[in-house]
């Protein structure tokens, strides 16, 4: 399963839609990769400069590795990301994601990774997860 977010339209009518990176599982011989597109081929996160130039109502406030979120073990699972997006105008936003209640499991003695989370913070300060 992949994680994706959609919301916003640029001046040409193109919609904002992107897959959200995560961590890949470890293998028998190496740690997993952090902040990568795991199950979607031919996709990547939009560069912040491109995102903000094309979609002027969107600001990427933070995009960083979520250190410690990958599962521990002989070889550690890759860490996910934190991506904080600020919509400067009212928008309808959709997100499709998984592993928010049940963590990614560990195999061959590895520990589970941390659950992901989605948080919507409204202008009023109300938070919805």
Regions picked out by a protein language model, each given a short descriptive name:
Residues 1-129:
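Glycine/proline-enriched, intrinsically flexible loops and inter-domain linkers
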């Amino acid at each position: 399963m992949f994680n994706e977010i959609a919301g916003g339209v640029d001046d040409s009518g193109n919609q904002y839609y992107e897959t959200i990176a995560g961590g890949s599982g470890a293998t028998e011989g190496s740690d997993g990769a952090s902040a990568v597109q795991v199950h979607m081929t031919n996709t990547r996160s939009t560069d912040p400069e491109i995102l903000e130039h094309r979609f002027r109502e969107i600001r990427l406030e933070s995009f960083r590795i979520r250190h410690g979120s990958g599962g521990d073990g002989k070889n550690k699972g890759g860490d996910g990301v934190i991506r904080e997006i600020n919509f400067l105008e009212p928008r309808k936003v959709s997100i499709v994601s998984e592993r928010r209640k049940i963590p990614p499991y560990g195999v061959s003695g590895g520990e589970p990774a941390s659950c992901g989370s989605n948080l919507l913070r409204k202008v009023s300060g109300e938070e919805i997860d």
